[in-house]
């Protein structure tokens, strides 16, 4: 069953479209990440779901209830939607317990019990209940913000780049902890982020927006391996884009012959490979099934490195190809190597000028 349904949602500001005819379904209990460059409309879409903005046309429904359509809209405070902004937005004049309990009704013992449950749920020690926001670490502040958003048992959780202000190591651990917590609570969740790796690891469903439109939506692995176009391919990670000639399930390109899944395709096209699909081998004279190249740059990042390898391209021009490898295999500039492809190339469409 789908929890959230967006149907042809459109929003303009001053006559300039910000969100254009977005239709998207989110299954109950799922995690959807919405990604896109700045100005793509992802935050405006999130604000319309929350009730901070209203669509010019279209329909937003949650668990069968229409939240907004041409007839009107349910106010934000009546939607039972949790919202965690980028900075957590804790009240500085309230301690942790008061922040979490803000908006909770009921008698004090019941309220205190619920606060204790929420502290335990987000893995915060009960001793932190009396602390002030400025006495907490960034990760602790985000956990308090999440507990506050969960306090009233929301039907939907909205996360607006909640991990972006955290240190790299803490960001990864917090992302995993929050994903696990929300899955255990069974709360349908939407994450808006500009971090592609974060979106790929967090979500069950990935939605890519560009210029206010939904470009592609589906399972993260599907979008990463089979993007709809070159822009989406490059937005979701490094990609090797090459012109090729297709025939009988093979693509003839600057890297040699690469298999493709679409055996019926024939003629000029553009193909995509991810850097991890390229294997660097020593240039020992055995060229079978590989392509010669020269290391032009090595971007060393500790446990990994990205090699820029020059190979002979069309018309005698050198084509630089990024290859992702273990940091143990970082090679000096000028090294002669061979490249072997792994798996199938993805066909993006006709090559420029084809």
UniProtKB/Swiss-Prot annotation:
An example Gene Ontology CC term for this record: ATP-binding cassette (ABC) transporter complex
Key word Iron present: yes
CDD domains documented for this protein: ABC_Carb_Solutes_like
Residues given in the record as ATP binding sites: 36-43
The protein's Enzyme Commission number: 7.2.2.7
Ranges of residues in domain ABC transporter: 4-236
Any Pfam family: TOBE_2
Membrane topology classification: Peripheral membrane protein
Annotated transmembrane regions: none
Catalytic reaction equation(s): Fe(3+)(out) + ATP + H2O = Fe(3+)(in) + ADP + phosphate + H(+)
Annotated localization: Cell inner membrane
Keywords per UniProt: ATP-binding, Cell inner membrane, Cell membrane, Ion transport, Iron, Iron transport, Membrane, Nucleotide-binding, Translocase, Transport
Enzyme class name: translocase
Major location category of this protein: membrane
UniProt keyword Cell membrane present: yes
Domain of life: Bacteria
An MF annotation (GO) of this entry: ATP binding
Biological role stated in the UniProt entry: Part of the ABC transporter complex FbpABC involved in Fe(3+) ions import. Responsible for energy coupling to the transport system.
Assembly and interaction partners: The complex is composed of two ATP-binding proteins (FbpC), two transmembrane proteins (FbpB) and a solute-binding protein (FbpA).
Similarity remark: Belongs to the ABC transporter superfamily. Fe(3+) ion importer (TC 3.A.1.10) family.
Name by which UniProt lists this protein: Fe(3+) ions import ATP-binding protein FbpC
Record organism: Pseudomonas fluorescens (strain ATCC BAA-477 / NRRL B-23932 / Pf-5)
């Amino acid at each position: 069953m789908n929890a959230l349904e967006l149907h042809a949602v459109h929003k303009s500001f001053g006559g300039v479209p910000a969100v254009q005819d977005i239709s998207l379904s989110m299954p109950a209990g799922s995690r959807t990440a919405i990604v896109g460059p700045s100005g793509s409309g992802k935050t405006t879409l999130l604000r319309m779901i929350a009730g901070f903005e209203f669509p010019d046309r279209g329909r937003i429904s949650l668990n069968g209830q229409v939240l907004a359509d041409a007839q009107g809209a349910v106010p934000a405070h009546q939607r039972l939607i949790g919202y965690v902004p980028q900075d957590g937005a804790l009240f500085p004049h309230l301690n942790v317990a008061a922040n979490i309990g803000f908006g909770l009704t009921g008698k004090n013992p019941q309220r205190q019990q619920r606060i204790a449950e929420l502290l335990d749920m987000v893995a915060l020690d009960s001793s932190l209940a009396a602390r002030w926001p400025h006495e907490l670490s960034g990760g602790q502040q985000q956990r308090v913000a999440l507990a506050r958003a969960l306090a009233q048992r929301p039907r939907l959780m909205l996360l607006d780049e909640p991990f972006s202000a955290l240190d790299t190591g803490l960001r990864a651990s917090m992302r995993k902890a929050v994903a696990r917590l929300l899955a255990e609570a069974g709360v349908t969740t939407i994450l808006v982020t500009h971090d592609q790796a974060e979106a790929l690891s967090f979500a069950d469903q990935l939605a890519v927006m560009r210029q206010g439109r939904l470009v592609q939506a589906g399972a993260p692995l599907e979008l990463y391996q089979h993007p709809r176009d070159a822009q989406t391919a490059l937005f979701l990670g490094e990609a090797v884009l090459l012109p090729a000639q297709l025939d009988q399930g093979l693509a003839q390109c600057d890297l040699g012959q690469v298999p493709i899944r679409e055996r019926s395709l024939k003629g000029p096209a553009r193909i995509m490979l991810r850097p991890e699909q390229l294997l660097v081998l020593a240039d020992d004279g055995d060229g079978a099934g590989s392509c010669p190249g020269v290391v032009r740059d090595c971007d060393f990042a500790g446990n990994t490195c990205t090699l820029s390898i020059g190979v002979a391209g069309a018309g005698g021009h050198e084509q630089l190809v990024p290859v992702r490898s273990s940091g143990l295999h970082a090679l000096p500039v000028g090294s002669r190597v061979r490249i072997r492809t792994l798996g199938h190339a993805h066909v993006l469409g006709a090559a420029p000028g084809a």
